[in-house]
């Protein structure tokens, strides 16, 4: 009983370790209701001012020389996504080496070499020589292109002491094959916000843009666990 239980236990441990390693190769799936991307509400609720019967009421004033752009915590900003990235790389290398050497011996242990070899009838010679050649060539190319367009409306999460706005938010779209997600977070200058309260994603500093999805369509674009094993660093070949 003990001889059979040890191999079975070893196989079980090896299987669990393999499953754990393969699961580590899987990219984390985005989930809804992430508290980090939840809408940020103003820290101090605005209290309704009492109506005193006057024409001009407190709390309803507007700046005659400005516009209604976001500049407070909880304000809303629409970010226009216009991301286009393209990268290409090529490398070529070639190395070659040729070598020729020869050694000629006219004496052995102080005695001259005879030219009459009684064995085989050939002359005796200890001359040696070799030729060597080595050539290495390599060629590599890589190209990648990405594009993301659209718009996401986010909220101001914080206002830095220098007036920079920290914004973040997300958009979930439920389709017939699953959910599509767009998340964005970064830093925005108030001067870069247009009069219609929009800002381009190219003007966001330290931008974190995520486009992902869940459902059948997202699952089919991911390789299975068996394929991930052959594509992982664990595969020795």
Swiss-Prot record:
Keyword Cytoplasm assigned to the entry: answer is no
Question: Keyword set for this entry?
Answer: Bacterial flagellum, Cell outer membrane, Lipoprotein, Membrane, Palmitate, Signal
The molecular function terms in GO held by this entry are: cytoskeletal motor activity
Q: How does it sit in the membrane?
A: Lipid-anchor
Q: Where is the lipid attached (N-palmitoyl cysteine)?
A: 25
**Where does lipidation (S-diacylglycerol cysteine) occur on this chain?**
25
Where found, per UniProt? Cell outer membrane; Bacterial flagellum basal body
Alphabetized NCBIfam families for the sequence = PRK00249.1-4
Please describe what this protein does. Answer: Assembles around the rod to form the L-ring and probably protects the motor/basal body from shearing forces during rotation.
Say which family it is in: Belongs to the FlgH family.
Its quaternary structure? The basal body constitutes a major portion of the flagellar organelle and consists of four rings (L,P,S, and M) mounted on a central rod.
Please state what the protein is called. Answer: Flagellar L-ring protein
Its lineage opens with: Bacteria, Pseudomonadati, Pseudomonadota, Gammaproteobacteria, Pseudomonadales
């Amino acid at each position: 009983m003990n001889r059979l239980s040890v191999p079975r236990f070893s196989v079980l441990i090896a299987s669990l370790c393999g499953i754990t390693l393969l699961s580590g190769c899987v990219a984390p799936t985005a989930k809804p209701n992430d508290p980090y991307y939840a809408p940020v509400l103003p820290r101090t609720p605005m209290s309704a001012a009492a109506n005193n019967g006057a024409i001009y009421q407190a709390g309803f004033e507007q700046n005659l020389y400005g516009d209604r752009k976001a500049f407070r915590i909880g304000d809303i900003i629409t970010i226009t996504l216009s991301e286009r990235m393209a990268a290409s790389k090529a490398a070529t290398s070639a190395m070659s080496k040729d070598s020729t050497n020869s050694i000629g011996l006219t004496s052995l242990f102080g005695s001259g070499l005879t030219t009459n070899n009684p064995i085989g009838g050939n002359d005796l010679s200890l001359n040696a020589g070799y030729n060597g050649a080595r050539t290495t060539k390599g060629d590599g190319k890589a190209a990648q292109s990405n594009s993301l367009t659209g718009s996401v409306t986010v909220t101001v999460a914080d206002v830095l002491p220098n007036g920079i706005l920290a914004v973040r938010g997300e958009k979930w779209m439920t389709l017939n094959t699953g959910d599509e997600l767009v998340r964005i977070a970064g830093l925005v200058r108030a001067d870069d916000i247009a009069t219609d309260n929009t800002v381009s994603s190219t003007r966001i500093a330290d931008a974190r843009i995520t486009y992902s999805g869940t459902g059948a369509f997202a699952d089919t674009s991911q390789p299975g666990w068996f394929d991930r094993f052959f594509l992982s660093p664990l595969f020795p070949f």
